[in-house]
């Protein structure tokens, strides 16, 4: 995976945004946690931007890489691979950039206040990347982007529907976490990703070809905590 940029101007703006995020203290319960925004999020020149819910305790909060290092990440990697995509071709972020935990240290759903607090950062990320299509993963992410531009979509009724949204298109999909696969199986999610891939077929020029990596993800075994782990369901 790479955080390489083609535009030095965009690279500088992204670096400034990452620096700003690291100093955020808007959410008292989260401000001490890792802020998951860096070159490891993907390619800021991509035309495809995924928005998930939040860094998982055993995934991005541990690895620093969105949707990576736990069962949710494994599912996401498989969905990308099913359409012959690579992380180097897309950008991945979350509705909130810190891992929300309950009093027992387990993942919890972000509060509406936390989502609102982080919406400005989400908007800045989207504006910087300038994707042709924003793909939300799960109901929380779909709700979060409505803070930026209203859309009127509901995940259960509108999954895989594509609508104009701001200067981009919006496509709501289910989250690849273990719990979400109860409501929409991985088989169905593979079909959703196939539809997405058809929308951004290389011939359309929307999705970049895989560039030469400048930054490589560490092997899972090199990350504190060991091998890919089974995250508690979201």
Predicted regions located by residue number:
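A polyanion-binding, active-site-adjacent surface
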Residues: 2-157, 162-202, 206-207, 218
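Intrinsic disorder/low-complexity segments enriched in polar/small residues
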Residues: 20-23, 209-213, 232-233
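A short, charged, Gly/Pro-tolerant segment at domain boundaries
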Residues: 210-224
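Long, low-complexity, intrinsically disordered segments
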Residues: 220-234
